[in-house]
Amino acid sequence: MTRSLGDLARGRGDDADDFDDFDDFEEEISTKPKARATTRRSTRASTEDVYEEDGTDSPPRTSSWGRAGTFMDEHADGIALTLVGIAIVLGAAVWLGVGGPVGTFIADIVHLTIGAGAWVLPVALIAAAVALMLNYTPDPQSRTRVGIGGSIILLCMLGLIHLFAGNPAEWAGRKNAGGAIGAWVGTPLELGFSVYLAVPILFLILFYGALKTTGITIREFGGFVTGFFGFGAGAEDDDEEGDDLYGHVDREIETRASGRALPAAEPRPTRVTPRRTTSSTPRRAAASLDRYPADEPGTPPGPPPSVAPTGSRERKQTEASTSIEPALFPEPERRKPSVSETDEFPAVKAPETPAAEAPAPAKDSARDAVAASRENLRQAMIQRSGMDPQGPPKEEPEDNPGVVVSDGDSTYVLPSADLLIPGAPAKTHSETNDRIIEAITDVFREFNVDAAVTGFSRGPTVTRYEIELGPGVKVSKITNLQSNIAYAVATENVRLLTPIPGKSAVGIEVPNADREMVRLGDVLNAPATVDNLDPMLVGLGKDIEGDFVSYSVQKMPHLLVAGSTGSGKSAFVNSLLVSLLTRATPEEVRLILVDPKMVELTPYEGIPHLITPIITQPKKAAAALQWLVEEMEQRYMDMKQTRVRHIKDFNRKIKSGEIETPLGSKREYRAYPYIICVVDELADLMMTAPKEIEESIVRITQKARAAGIHLVLATQRPSVDVVTGLIKTNVPSRLAFATSSLTDSRVILDQGGAEKLIGMGDALFIPQGAGKPQRIQGAFVTDEEIQAVVEAAKVQAEPDYTDGVTEDKGGDSKKIDADIGDDLDDLLEAVELVVTSQIGSTSMLQRKLRIGFAKAGRLMDLMETRGVVGPSEGSKAREVLVKPEELDTILWMLKGADPADAPKEEQWGDDGYAEPVGEGPGDGSDDSSSSDGTTVVRANPAGGVF
C-alpha cells in the first residue's frame, strides 16, 4: 500500500482499512528497499485490486499459464512432495545403485534420455520442490520466459556434453554423454558444420538462454559485470539516495521533528522499482506530503487529496508497478537503523487544545485518528526495537570489576591470581655470561674451528649461546667439542642444540650460576595468559628466551610427566591444579585426583571441583579409570544422538536450547563439564593392577579427547614396564624433568636430553605435533599460596561427589567360563585384534601376540565356540562374524559381565518413542524420580551425574 504521511497525520479514518494500510506503510518504511518474498496471493491480489478500482463488471481474462499457476498454488505441497519422492528414487538408483528393479528401470530411461544429466536431475527436482514449499510462484510472463530459457539451456548443455564425449554412436556411450536429446542436438551440428564450429554455436545459444531466463539484456549484463568487478562502485554510491524509495519520507520526518519549515517540493524522477503487493486490499493513489501544512496548534487540516479516476492507462501502470518480477540484481543491502538512531527522532505529540477553544466535531474526530495512528506507531517501535521513544532512557549497567561466573542459580567467583606471590624482575645480563663467551671462544681457537659466538638468550635457569659457523665448517665439529666446552665452562650439564629452531645457528645451553625462581603468579598474570579465556589453560613456566609459557590441556590433550625425585614433577602438578582453580569453575572443569603417596595432593581435599574424594588406593584408582571409560562412552552416545562431534558443540546446543529430549524419553540432557584425571604416581598403579590400568588408560587416551576427558600421568620411574608402548603411543604430549639416565630420557621423550637437565624445575616440553622439545623452567608455587587459593574455592561451594566412581564393578557378577581358564587376557587381545582387522588367521595371532601355534589355535577355537569367527576353511582365513561396532559388547560378555549392564544408547522405536538399546519396555534400572514426576536418568551405569 502506498499512502502519504499526510494521510496519516490527518487521521483519515473513513474506512476500516485505514489502520491496515498504516501497518503496511510502517512495514514498508522499516524494511525500505529490501525485496520481499512473494506470496501465492500477490498475483491474484494485484489483479483483483485493478478490477475493483476500474469499476467494470467484466472479470479479468485468465490465460492457460494463469490456470496452471492457480492449480500449482492450490496443490503446491503435494507437487513438492511428489518431486521429492521422485528425486529420492532417482538419487538412490543413479548415485547409490540401490533403487531396485523399478528404480533401475527408471534410471535407465533417464540415462537414455538425458545421459549424464541424470546425475544432477535429483538436485534439480529438490530445488524445484523447495521453491514450491517456499511459495515462490512467478507471474505468467515470467513462467513463459523462464520455461523457454531453461529449455534452451538444457538442450545446449546436453548437446555440448555429447560433443565433448566424442559424439558416441552407440547407446551405451550416449548414456554417459548427453543421451538421446544430446545426440539429437549435437549430431546434426557436427555433421553440418564441424565440432570446432558446433561448440561455439551452442555456447552462443546457451548464453542467449541465460539472458532469456534472467530477463536482462546484454547491455544490462555488461553493467552488472563492471559493477561486480568494482568499475561502477563510485556511481553506485552516488545514486544511493536515489535508490531509496522512501528517502524523501525520512527527510520530511526529520524536518518536522526539528520544527523547521518544509522545503519547496521538487520534482522526483520516476523510477519503476520491482516490488510486490503484500496485501489484497486496494491501493490508493499516493499523495505528496508537501500538500499538507505542518501540524501546529490552531491550524485547520487541509482538504483531503483528490483521487483521480482510475482508467485503463493507470490500471496498466498499476499492474506494471505491482506485478513486475523481483529484480535480477538486487540493490545493495543497507543496514537497519539502530536503537540509538531511532531514539533521535522523538514522537510528535498531539497538540493540546484548551477547553475554551474546542474545535469542531470534525476536528475532534481527525485528532482522535491522529492520536490513534501515533500510538500504533509508538507501539510498533517498541515492539521492533524494545525501547519506548517517549519513555525515560535506560540506565547503563555498571561494570563489575570482579571475575564472576554465573551459572543458573549459582554464582562462583574465581580465586584471584593476586593471591599468588609475584617474582623478582628477570636478569638479562651478568658477568658470568661474558666469562662463558670468552671460554667458548677460546675452545674454538684452540681447535682451529671457524666459529664465533654471535649472541645469547638468558633464561631463568640456563643461557643459550648462539654459535655461527664459518664457510665450510661442519656442524659435527661443534658437537665433537661438547666435552671440551663443558670442561671450559666448568659444568657437566652442557646441552647442544643443532640447529636452533628457526635460526641458522648452533645453540650451546649452559646452566646459570645465579638461577632465578619462576613464580606461578607471574605466569598467570602475563598478558598472553590473561587475554586467553580458555578455562583449561595452565601455567608451565618460562622458556629459555625469558617468555612465559602456558598451554591448554585441551590441546595436549593428554600429558605424560616424568622425572626423578626432586626434579620438579610434584611442583608442576601443583602448578597445574592451582592454574585450573584460578581459571575454571566447578561447572566447567571437574577433577579426579589419584595420589598413591597419600601426601602430595592432600591440600586439595574438599575443593568443589572434585568428582570423588582423593583416591589413594590403587584398586579404587583402577575402578575410577574404568568409570571414566564408561563416562566417555556415554558422552559419545549422547553426541551421536545429537549429531555433534565435540563436547563444546554439545554444551553450546544445550545452553541455547537446540537439543530437546526425544518424545517419550525420560532422559534429561545437561551440559557436560570437562574432566581432568591427575595421577601423581603411575608406577604404584601399574604394580598393583597393570592390565586393567593400561587398558583403561589406552581406551581413554585413544577416544576421550572429543568427549572432554583428559589424563595427566606423572611418574618418577619412567621405565618400560611403567610407561608401556601403548601408553606412549596414545599420549602425545610429554613433559620430562631431569632423569637419572639416558634410557629413561628415551622412554619419556623418545630421544636423549632429559639426562642433561639440572633439576629443580628444569624441563623439556614436547606438545602435540611439535618436532623438538622446548626447554622451560617450571613455575613454582608455595604451600601458603596453594592453601590461599584452595580456601578461596572451598568457602564458595561444597564438593558434589558422584556415587560409584571408585566401586569395583568387576567382582560382583563376573563368571568366566571354565574352558577359558587363565587365558582371558590373551583371549580378549585376540578378539580385539581379529574383530578390528576382520581377519581370522591363526598365523596373524602368532605374529601379533607373540605366542606359539598351539595357543593361537586354542584361542581361535575359543573364539569359534563364542561366535566370533566361523569354522575352519583349511588354509584360508576364517570368516569374522562380529562387526567392529559390536566389539565392546563381545568383550563385555567374555569378561563374564551381564550384557544388560553395558553402556546403552537411545534410539527411536517403532512407535516413534525413544527406547534404550538392549532394554525391553519397562526396564528402567538406574532412574530416579523426583516429586514433580520428572525422571532423571544417570549418564552412565556407574552412577555418573554428567
Curated annotation (Swiss-Prot):
Cellular compartment(s): Cell membrane
Cited Pfam families: FtsK_4TM (PF13491), FtsK_alpha (PF17854), FtsK_gamma (PF09397), FtsK_SpoIIIE (PF01580)
CDD domains reported in the protein's UniProt record: TrwB_TraG_TraD_VirD4 (cd01127)
Keyword Hydrolase: no
Region ranges (Disordered): 1-68, 256-409, 898-946
Residues binding ATP: 566-571
BP GO annotations: cell division; chromosome segregation
Bias (Pro residues) ranges: 298-307
Cross-referenced Gene3D superfamilies: 3.30.980.40, P-loop containing nucleotide triphosphate hydrolases, Winged helix-like DNA-binding domain superfamily/Winged helix DNA-binding domain
One GO cellular component term noted in the UniProt record for this chain: plasma membrane
Function: Essential cell division protein that coordinates cell division and chromosome segregation. The N-terminus is involved in assembly of the cell-division machinery. The C-terminus functions as a DNA motor that moves dsDNA in an ATP-dependent manner towards the dif recombination site, which is located within the replication terminus region. Required for activation of the Xer recombinase, allowing activation of chromosome unlinking by recombination.
Protein name: DNA translocase FtsK
